[in-house]
């Protein structure tokens, strides 16, 4: 596992801990306040971060839910200079909620048509 993969895995543990304590507000605040680095050093950093998070999720000892996965992805992208936003959306029938990450209005860690399925509730 690469250094980026290790960072993703450790962030999965951290955000899992917050969610296990029922502390959505802390998770939300951490993602919102995560600073964006001045510049990205690699042109394909978005793909590399998403791939590292995917691999970390495979090796994680339990199922990683969309909120945890999106929080990790958004924070890592911000740390590497990408203005990422964790997006939370919901649909009415049947009721479902989902979280994903967008960069410049495009979904980067999930299916690209999510905005057509879910009404956006918030972005951070």
Q: Predicted regions span which residues?
A:
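Helix-boundary/low-complexity linker signature
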Residues: 1-124
């Amino acid at each position: 596992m690469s250094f980026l993969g290790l960072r993703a895995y450790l962030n999965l543990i951290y955000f899992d801990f917050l969610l296990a304590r029922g502390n959505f507000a802390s998770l939300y605040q951490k993602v919102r306040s995560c600073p964006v680095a001045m510049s990205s050093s690699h042109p394909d950093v978005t793909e590399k971060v998403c791939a590292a998070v995917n691999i970390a999720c495979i090796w994680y000892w339990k199922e990683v839910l969309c909120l945890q996965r999106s929080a990790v992805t958004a924070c890592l992208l911000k740390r590497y200079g990408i203005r990422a936003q964790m997006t939370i959306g919901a649909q009415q029938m049947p009721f479902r909620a989902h979280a994903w990450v967008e960069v410049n209005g495009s979904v980067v860690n999930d299916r690209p048509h999510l905005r057509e399925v879910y009404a956006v509730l918030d972005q951070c």
